[in-house]
Design a protein with these regions (language model features):
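Catalytic nucleophile-elbow at a beta strand-turn-alpha helix junction centered on a G-D-S/GDSL motif
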Residues: 39-56, 76-80
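Hydrophobic membrane-insertion alpha-helices, especially the h-region
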Residues: 1-6
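Alpha-helical cap/lid subdomain in secreted, periplasmic
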Residues: 12, 19, 59-65, 88-103, ...
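A short beta-strand-loop structural module common to alpha/beta enzyme folds
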Residues: 67-83
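Structural signal for conserved beta-strand scaffold positions within catalytic alpha/beta enzyme cores
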Residues: 44, 72-74, 245-249
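N-terminal, intrinsically disordered, polar/charged segments of Gram-positive cell-envelope systems
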Residues: 10-39
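Ligand-binding grooves and catalytic loops that recognize ribose/phosphate and carbohydrate rings
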Residues: 16, 82-87
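Hydrophobic/aromatic residues located in beta-strands of well-ordered beta-sheets
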Residues: 42, 70, 215-216
Length: 316
């Protein structure tokens, strides 16, 4: 299973989520928490739009709707490159540091195998907090004020001088081939010219590491953050073909009807600008609320059936 966010956590969240859903869905709670032994585990891989907050996340809604085992993996502020690192596809290194005898933080830079400095792992996530460097276990942290990473060894020991590229290791997830991956990344990727192609490069790395053909890539959603989001999604669709789920298009069209919401004046202004209606979003106008997450879970379920990853009879 993927580390960091286990199935038990999702099960507990799922119950809270069902209670939350009752506020706008007059349906009885389904107390079932057992997953069918023959159904796949679903791995939801991404940033804050996947990790969610408290009891509201689309993986929680997905678990509630299908009764499948669901695992979350990633980090709230992760770029696609960060997730490729967390998955173990991209190895990271450090160099030219001295790890002291005591548990004193030491500044370090992170490099790739070609000695290029990487601007990565600035937020917390499923792994790469507890790490090992040159056989010494410790904690990797990012100081946003000083814009530097630090390594603090767990226990006092012998000083270690590092003068060559040395891998920073962490616990890496394993993935079973018959399971399903939902990849929802790119929202926090750098907004540079042709940046979407870097997103695709790292999404390819993630898919390659998963070693499965059973995956779905969710579209980018936020035009507020990504002004050319529709053009970016066209590129993603061309790359991922039938695996691509255009959730943004759905939200701007059928999602309003399916959610059974009455558009507010603000929602109508949002739609005129090509923005996701505020009624689907949290106060940050980026992350989805419970309605958003429920609709995404439903669209992913439909997509998994269309792609024959699951059978509709598998759903509770």
């Amino acid at each position: 299973t993927l580390i960091g966010y286990n199935t038990l956590t999702i099960r507990k969240e799922s119950q809270k989520y069902q209670e939350l859903q009752q506020k706008y869905q007059n349906q009885p709670l389904d107390e079932t928490t057992h997953s069918n032994a023959n159904t796949p585990t679903i791995y939801c891989i991404g940033d804050s739009l996947t990790i969610g907050a408290k009891s509201s996340s689309y993986p929680t809604a997905l678990s509630s709707a299908t009764n499948f085992s669901v695992n979350k993996f990633g980090g709230a502020q992760d770029q696609t490159q960060d997730i490729a690192i967390r998955m173990g596809k991209i190895k990271i290194y450090t160099n030219n540091i001295t790890i002291p005898e005591t548990a004193t933080p030491v500044n370090l830079k992170i490099y790739d195998k070609d000695n290029n400095v990487l601007n990565v792992l600035k937020g917390k996530g499923s792994n790469f907090t507890t790490v090992e460097i040159a056989g010494i276990s410790g904690k990797l942290k990012y100081n946003a004020t000083k814009k530097t990473h630090t390594f603090t060894r767990d226990q006092n020991g012998v000083e270690k001088v590092i003068t060559k590229l040395t891998q920073i290791k962490s616990e890496i997830p394993t993935f079973e081939k018959n399971n399903v991956a939902i990849i929802f990344t790119g929202t926090y990727d750098p907004q540079t010219q042709n940046g979407i192609f870097k997103t695709i490069t790292y999404q390819r790395a993630i898919i390659n590491q998963l070693k499965t053909k059973n995956y779905i890539v969710v579209s980018l959603t936020s035009k507020r953050r990504l002004p050319i989001v529709d053009d970016m999604n066209k590129v993603l669709k061309e790359e991922h073909k039938e695996h691509f789920l255009d959730f943004r298009y759905y939200l701007l069209n059928d999602g309003i009807k399916d959610a059974k919401i009455t558009l507010t004046a603000q929602d109508k202004k949002d739609l005129q600008k090509g923005y996701i209606p505020s009624s689907f979003l949290q106060v940050d106008m980026l992350n989805g609320n419970a309605k958003f997450n429920q609709l995404l879970a439903e669209q992913i379920t439909k997509k998994m059936i269309d792609l024959k990853y699951i059978d509709k009879n598998d759903i509770k």
